[in-house]
Amino acid sequence: MEEFSEKETTVGVAFIDVNGLKEINDRFGHEAGDQLLQTGAAIMQSSVPEGNLYRVGGDEFVIICPDVEEAEFRDIIQKLKDTFNREECKAAVGYEWTHSCRNLKAIIRSADQKMYEDKEQFYQQHAEAGRYRH
């Protein structure tokens, strides 16, 4: 992170969290959940420049793309959303793009917060059906 934060360059940051993974593990077993994560990670890796995707938790990933134009970054995000746009498994995505890496920690916090808001919205939409817990 330090290597980016000193640069005066554009940067896109995204947090991705796979919604419904616990339910998939409970219903189909952890092998199915692991396969989903491996497949999803491979798809994400093919969607972003090499070396910019990081797994930060069980089902959480972060993307940090320096030197990327805003339109290109939005295309990357849309491709990721489309990949995980399934009723049984959607990804919560929060992202930020900025002209400067100077305040990278604040950008990361904002993208993370937006991901949690997206995740909460997903679970609220499915709460009445009793489909998901978190």
Residue ranges of predicted features:
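Conserved long alpha-helical elements within nucleotide-processing catalytic cores of c-di-GMP signaling
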Residues: 1-12, 19-46, 54-58, 62-63, ...
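Flexible, nucleotide-binding loop/lid elements of kinase catalytic cores
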Residues: 11, 28, 94-96, 125
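Conserved Rossmann-like nucleotide-binding pocket used by diverse enzymes
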Residues: 14, 64, 94
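Short beta-strand-to-loop capping motifs
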Residues: 63-68, 97-99
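Catalytic-core segments of nucleotide cyclases and related cyclic-nucleotide turnover enzymes
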Residues: 74-81, 85, 96-134
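PAS and PAS-like sensory/regulatory domains
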Residues: 87-92
